[in-house]
A protein has these predicted regions:
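Conserved short loop/turn motifs at secondary-structure junctions
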Residues: 1, 25-32, 104-109, 136-137
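S-adenosyl-L-methionine
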Residues: 3-39
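A conserved structural/catalytic subdomain of Rossmann-like adenosyl-cofactor enzymes
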Residues: 38-285
């Protein structure tokens, strides 16, 4: 790591740029608060690495930002899972009305021992706003499920003793075999739940109007597509009647099997043309 930092400094110098590049414990977020953000942030958004282990507890303690104390420390004086260090940091960075939203391993929502005590203290602050359980396969490299945590130090007084829990583990859109996501409308639906919980009915009503507008537009497009399909089928109705008559006349006057070959080719042509038109209609409307 130290070599990489020196290499980076040299690269910046070659390009005529000044930079402060740190390495070792000085560059480790657990052991050093490089930006002195405690109590400064209006907003915190983060997707920290999950389940980091072997974090030196003494160095972490000295770096501060632990309003609820250290999570569990093992016999080697190491924090064996740093998830709750991140949770504590994000909370500590908020100012008096700050809000935080971050991704955390799903296992952190019900972990025991000292982490359970930290969760209890968090809830007692009245600043835990919402928790959302998310399905697996929401990351390209990680298949495990996760959860979304939201803090709000400026919560309304009537919500101080409440926490909204949303179980969205079965709510997603499949992108492919290894990846899920929320569609635009699915995210709006999750927002709607939060709005109603907070009493923001006007936002919910606006979303309903957006839905109404979308549905009306979809119905208009559907009517147009049905009309086009009807015209297409009527056109082929006449061709099919003509084809039927040609088949009947050919069969009536056929004297040898070879005389049916042109009829076979004609049927193939009509079938291919019909399939092509229907396919184009289905794909492009």
């Amino acid at each position: 790591v130290e070599f990489n930092a020196k290499l980076c400094i040299m690269n910046m110098a070659v390009h005529g740029l000044n930079a402060k590049i740190k390495s070792g414990d000085e560059a480790n977020s657990f052991y050093h608060d490089a930006h002195n953000l405690e109590g400064c942030c209006d907003y915190v958004m983060a997707n920290p690495p999950f389940n980091v282990d072997k974090v030196k507890s003494e160095s972490t303690q000295n770096a501060g930002r632990l309003p609820f104390g250290l999570p569990g420390v093992n016999a080697k004086k190491e924090v064996s899972n740093a998830n709750y260090l991140w949770v504590s940091y994000f909370y500590a960075y908020l100012n008096d009305v700050g809000r935080a939203g971050f991704v955390m391993a799903a296992s952190s929502t019900d972990s025991g021992n000292k982490e359970r005590e930290i969760r209890k203290q968090l809830i007692q602050t009245g600043h835990v706003d919402c928790m959302i359980s998310v399905a697996n396969n929401f990351f390209y490299k990680v298949s495990l499920p996760c959860s979304l945590w939201f803090f709000d130090k400026g919560k309304k007084e009537e919500l101080k003793d409440k926490v909204l829990f949303i179980d969205a583990r079965n709510y997603y859109t499949v992108v492919d075999r290894t990846l899920n996501e929320w569609s635009e409308w699915q995210m709006k639906n999750l927002n709607a739940i939060v709005w109603l919980y907070r009493g923001e009915v006007d936002k919910y009503e606006k979303l309903l109007m957006d839905y109404r507008t979308q549905i009306i537009g979809d119905c208009y497009e559907l009517d147009t597509e049905f009309e086009a399909l009807s015209v297409l089928l009527k056109g082929y109705g006449g061709k099919l009647m003509e084809l039927r008559q040609q088949v009947a006349d050919t069969i009536l006057h056929v004297e040898h099997i070879n005389q049916l070959l042109p009829l076979n080719e004609m049927l193939k042509h009509y079938t291919a043309e019909l399939n092509s038109s229907l396919k184009a209609f289905i794909e492009y409307g």
